[in-house]
């Protein structure tokens, strides 16, 4: 059964990619940032993530935000395990910084996925400040142990608990997964907890509404450690999604930021496994990110000229034609069939 599920999932993703290539004027672009120590070896472990994004229907490209501008056709930017910081806000006279480009991209209804290695996260000052404004604060000095929900003996390979609150954004993203009688496991290895920076999980920014929701969290009995010392117990956030709602011409538009504090979430051992749902969740998120967008700009024409451009005589001639010709064809066909049968 597991094998069938994996094959079906793969076929679905390939089919979606093929449909998008045929129907879209241009395939939407998904960028992977480079220039911050990210793993760019597409023949190595990151290949699974690149392939998954491509099979979701994206044109996958690298981008160095310090040198390149974001293509208007881009829908998604992925920051995967950076070790060095992004350029922060600068004087306008020298152009847009990397953070400012990310900000403008999200303002333009793009979406962002952030996978942070907590061992290097504390050095990402500018990126952390940017994510703070989206309700996300990583507690890099802590590691989560959830012995009650772990696939490893040490308790640090945490099985994330799905958000079952039907009123929250995260639940709607992967509702098809949580509707199963038994949900597949999603793994967070050596993860740090995420704090919400919004009071009541909402904030208004420049008249736009933002809301943050836990995509996954631990059990209520999870523990957090600092340098092998137990410093807290309770339920902790493993992955969050923030949605910004913008009203344009009385229509709602959305941008998203997905974040998790573990370098292992996108590891090939989890993305390629038939056992775990890490890839299924990311795929569900990407579909949610893109559903407010129209994949192809197909022009349509409204026909509002209802006047007849023929005379009455012409109309009568066409009427006689459609009354006589079909009847004549039927008679001739009947005669032909009768003769054939008689002399057969």
Residue ranges and their predicted role:
Residues 1-344:
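Short, surface-exposed patches at the edges or C-terminal ends of soluble domains, predominantly
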């Amino acid at each position: 059964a597991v094998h069938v599920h994996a094959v079906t999932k793969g076929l679905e993703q390939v089919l979606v990619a093929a449909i998008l290539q045929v129907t879209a004027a241009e395939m939407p672009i998904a960028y992977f940032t480079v220039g911050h120590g990210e793993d760019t070896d597409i023949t190595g472990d990151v290949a699974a993530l690149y392939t998954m994004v491509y099979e979701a229907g994206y044109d996958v490209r690298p981008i160095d935000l310090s040198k390149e501008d974001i293509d208007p056709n881009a829908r998604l930017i992925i920051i995967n395990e950076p070790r060095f910081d992004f350029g922060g806000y600068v004087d306008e006279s020298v152009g847009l910084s990397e953070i400012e480009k990310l900000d403008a991209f999200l303002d333009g209804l793009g979406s962002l996925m952030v996978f942070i290695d907590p061992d290097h996260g504390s050095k990402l000052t500018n990126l952390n400040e940017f994510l703070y404004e989206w309700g996300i604060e990583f507690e890099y000095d802590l590691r989560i142990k959830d012995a009650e929900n772990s696939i490893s003996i040490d308790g640090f390979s945490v099985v994330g608990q799905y958000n079952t609150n039907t009123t929250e954004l995260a639940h709607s993203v992967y509702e098809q997964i949580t509707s199963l009688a038994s949900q597949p496991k999603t793994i967070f290895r050596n993860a740090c907890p995420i704090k919400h920076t919004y009071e009541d999980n909402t904030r208004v920014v420049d008249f736009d509404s933002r809301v943050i929701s836990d995509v996954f969290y631990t059990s209520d009995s999870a523990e957090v450690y600092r340098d092998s010392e137990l410093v807290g117990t309770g339920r902790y956030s493993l992955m969050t999604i923030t949605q910004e709602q913008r009203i344009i011409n009385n229509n709602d538009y959305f941008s998203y930021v997905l974040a998790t504090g573990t370098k292992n979430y996108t590891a090939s051992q989890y993305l390629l496994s038939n056992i775990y749902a890490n890839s299924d969740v990311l795929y569900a998120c990407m579909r949610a990110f893109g559903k407010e967008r129209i994949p192809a700009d197909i022009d349509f024409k409204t026909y509002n000229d209802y006047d007849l451009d023929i005379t009455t005589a012409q109309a009568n001639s066409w009427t006689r034609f459609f009354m006589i010709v079909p009847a004549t064809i039927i008679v001739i066909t009947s005669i032909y069939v009768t003769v054939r049968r008689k002399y057969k």
